[in-house]
Curated annotation (Swiss-Prot):
<keyword id="KW-0808">Transferase</keyword>
<dbReference type="GO" id="GO:0005507">
    <property type="term" value="F:copper ion binding"/>
</dbReference>
<dbReference type="Pfam" id="PF02578">
    <property type="entry name" value="Cu-oxidase_4"/>
</dbReference>
<keyword id="KW-0560">Oxidoreductase</keyword>
<comment type="subunit">
    <text>Homodimer.</text>
</comment>
<keyword id="KW-0378">Hydrolase</keyword>
<protein>
    <recommendedName>
        <fullName>Purine nucleoside phosphorylase XF_0940</fullName>
        <ecNumber>2.4.2.1</ecNumber>
        <ecNumber>3.5.4.4</ecNumber>
        <ecNumber>2.4.2.28</ecNumber>
    </recommendedName>
</protein>
<comment type="similarity">
    <text>Belongs to the purine nucleoside phosphorylase YfiH/LACC1 family.</text>
</comment>
<dbReference type="GO" id="GO:0017061">
    <property type="term" value="F:S-methyl-5-thioadenosine phosphorylase activity"/>
</dbReference>
<keyword id="KW-0186">Copper</keyword>
<dbReference type="InterPro" id="IPR003730">
    <property type="entry name" value="Cu_polyphenol_OxRdtase"/>
</dbReference>
<dbReference type="GO" id="GO:0004000">
    <property type="term" value="F:adenosine deaminase activity"/>
</dbReference>
<comment type="function">
    <text>Purine nucleoside enzyme that catalyzes the phosphorolysis of adenosine and inosine nucleosides, yielding D-ribose 1-phosphate and the respective free bases, adenine and hypoxanthine. Also catalyzes the phosphorolysis of S-methyl-5'-thioadenosine into adenine and S-methyl-5-thio-alpha-D-ribose 1-phosphate. Also has adenosine deaminase activity.</text>
</comment>
<feature type="binding site">
    <location>
        <position position="79"/>
    </location>
    <ligand>
        <name>Zn(2+)</name>
    </ligand>
</feature>
<feature type="binding site">
    <location>
        <position position="120"/>
    </location>
    <ligand>
        <name>Zn(2+)</name>
    </ligand>
</feature>
<keyword id="KW-0862">Zinc</keyword>
<dbReference type="InterPro" id="IPR011324">
    <property type="entry name" value="Cytotoxic_necrot_fac-like_cat"/>
</dbReference>
């Protein structure tokens, strides 16, 4: 993994054999201008506000400069719980429209899965033998609706043989939320209260990493098989895009694939 450039963050975990996982940083060799500078990778629909032609050029540069085995499977993310399975047929056909989903799984060698974020939590799942992977866009809505549990269930590997990596996201000392977010978790599960710390009446800091660990463990993963966390997108403007911090912001990608 040492072959990757400085504008790439390689996952800090004991990677299963053949599994590659990384997140891009905003300072990569992109063409987007402020406030999307420079390597903004989404969305081509213009949702993030950047010119679609810039996003397309950035995505092309990403594939070329990282030497990716194939064009990533970009998703139309909607803060939902839909999981896309990338099989050999889907990998082989041209991708004209981004499928609507907030997670993807595959066992196809060389298929590159991608998640776009700018404060939401990107999560990568992998079988310990490297036979299967999944990626998840886990914002607070998705976490509350258990997108992680649904993705674990979509994988063919038994949960005790899975491991997870939590990528850069809004940190627990920077991401303040209101009653709606607090209630979405605590009214369903009182144990989620430990992931919230009061900042002022009716407001809390929320620990997305803690909530993700709770849900992954509930889905059957062991605590020792969950890695990452601790990189705050809001407090690190040099490296990460942040919607909460900047409002108009680009998106960085978390990519995963099974190497040949």
């Amino acid at each position: 993994m040492g072959r990757f450039p400085s504008w790439v963050l390689v996952a800090d975990w004991p990677a299963p054999p053949g599994v590659m996982v990384l997140s891009t940083l905003r300072g990569g060799p992109g063409v987007s201008v402020a406030p999307f500078d420079r390597l903004n990778l989404g969305n081509c629909s213009g949702v993030a506000g950047d010119a679609p032609v810039c996003v397309e050029r950035n995505r092309s540069r990403l594939v070329e400069m990282l030497g990716l085995p194939s064009v990533p499977h970009w998703l139309r993310q909607v803060h939902g719980v839909e999981v896309l399975r990338v099989d050999a047929l889907l990998q082989s056909i041209a991708r004209v429209v981004e499928p609507t989903a907030d997670a993807a799984v595959t066992s196809v060698v060389g298929a590159v899965l991608a998640i776009l974020t700018a404060d939401c939590l990107p999560v990568v799942l992998a079988a310990v033998d490297g036979s299967e992977i999944g990626v998840v866009h886990a914002g607070w809505r998705g976490l509350a609706d258990d997108v992680l549990g649904r993705t674990v269930a979509a994988l063919r590997t038994s949960p005790e043989y899975l491991q997870a990596w939590l990528g850069p996201a809004a940190g627990p000392q920077a991401y303040e939320v209101g009653v709606d977010v607090y209630a979405a978790f605590v009214e369903r599960d009182s144990g989620a209260a430990c992931a919230f710390s009061v900042t002022r009446p009716g407001h809390w800091y929320v620990d997305l990493y803690a909530l993700a660990r709770q849900r992954l463990m509930r889905a059957g993963l062991s605590a020792v098989s969950i890695y990452g966390g601790g990189l705050c997108t809001i407090s690190d403007p040099q490296r990460f895009f942040s919607h909460r911090r900047d409002r108009r912001s680009g998106r960085f990608a978390t990519l995963a694939w099974i190497g040949c």
